[in-house]
């Protein structure tokens, strides 16, 4: 059902609304020499992007939701998270640049895979350190969510680019 996509929905909501906020902020910076006023197109962009971070649940809540659901699914065995954490701990840093395959986007693919391994290592260390109290460590969870958002967006862009190249 729809619950199967709750993690992805939370990641997309947070990432997209914060990217929109950053774009509006850059627009204000560009138009800053003329002074911020309602006469610029950035006024509505800024307002809309700020409101977007609040609607449909605040970004902070969605960050907690995404990581919380991921860890719960891992603990229940719905996702093979713990075996992936163990594997990540063993293989991280074992490949050399020379070991990367040739081909279009090979380096990008390698980089994204390393991002994933790094996330798994950090999540595993956090789980080991805090155990069941991890849900109380909001700063750790927010940092994990931020990493996960970047991985999700990077891999989505990578997969779309790879699909376009293969056409």
Per-region residue spans from a language model:
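Alpha-helical interface subdomain recognition
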Residues: 1-167
